[in-house]
Amino acid sequence: MFPYVTDYSGFAIRKWMIDNVDVAGFLCLLYLGLVWKGPGVVKSLREKNLINATLLQGVFIMWNLFLSTFSVIGMIVVVPAAIAHISNKGLVPALCERDVNMIYDSPVGFWVGVFALSKIPELFDTVLLVLQGKQPPFLHWYHHTTVLIFSWQSYCEGSSTIFVFVAMNLTVHAVMYFYFAMCASGFKAIMRTIAPVITIMQILQMIVGSAVTMYSAYVLYNPQPDGPQTCDVTKASARMGVVMYLSYLYLFAALFVESYLKPKKRTEKSK
């Protein structure tokens, strides 16, 4: 599948990302400025009727359909390869030994590289939310900024565990962005039933991510005489991954409890 990337090598992209690592920082600063100041600017624009709500909704739908399609195609390539890689090498060697075919070379390497770079245009999600007059919640902008930084670092260093994170993220995003597109298209009542399923998928993703990052950190700080002496992950990346995934796990679990388990407060009309 995708023969045009059979001989692909991502080392040129890796070099560009290493040489321009400051770009990730500048983008995050601009992004946070949008999150904090954007809603106020947009409010004044909406009061002057300078934003076309119908056009904006159409762009929102098409953008989410594009991201869902992108994720599906990437998932079709990366997920089977990740499963085969773990099956052939064993779980521990697959996680701790760098394989360039799972990071930089081959169709899988192509999609891992595209995935790392895709975290930049994904910030457009927030632009659309702000233009709709919404204040992005903490989980939304925290997730976008930290994923961008972590993906950039993991790809540049050739983290041996990156393929796991890519496979999981593409799978969840394939469903999540399709859900957003359908809700915006007028099918919210129908799609509402799968909303808890998506949050559960996200929680499972964070559980696996936490386990993988904690294991790699454990091996790095506690080499085993009868086991792996090290993992091809830097200590900085391992620490960042542990903090990031554990914080995600807490935030998504809290979101699930708040959204689906807590009893809803009744309004005056419903009393």
UniProtKB/Swiss-Prot annotation:
Highest taxon of the lineage: Eukaryota
Residue interval(s) of motif HxxHH motif: 140-144
Keywords noted in UniProt: Endoplasmic reticulum, Fatty acid biosynthesis, Fatty acid metabolism, Glycoprotein, Lipid biosynthesis, Lipid metabolism, Membrane, Transferase, Transmembrane, Transmembrane helix
One family name in Pfam for this protein: ELO
EC number: 2.3.1.-
Subcellular locations according to the entry: Endoplasmic reticulum membrane
UniProt entry tagged with the keyword GTP-binding: no
GO MF annotation list: fatty acid elongase activity
GO BP term, example: long-chain fatty acid biosynthetic process
InterPro entries noted in UniProt: ELO_fam
GO cellular-component term (any): endoplasmic reticulum membrane
Transmembrane segments: 16-36, 59-79, 110-130, 162-182, 194-214, 241-261
Disruption of the gene: reported phenotype: Genetic disruption in bloodstream form parasites reduces fatty acid synthesis from C10- and C12-CoA primers.
Catalytic activity: an acyl-CoA + malonyl-CoA + H(+) = a 3-oxoacyl-CoA + CO2 + CoA
Similarity annotation: Belongs to the ELO family.
Role description: Involved in the synthesis of fatty acids. Elongates C10 fatty acids to C14.
Name listed for the protein in its UniProt record: Fatty acid elongase 2
Organism classification: Eukaryota, Discoba, Euglenozoa, Kinetoplastea, Metakinetoplastina
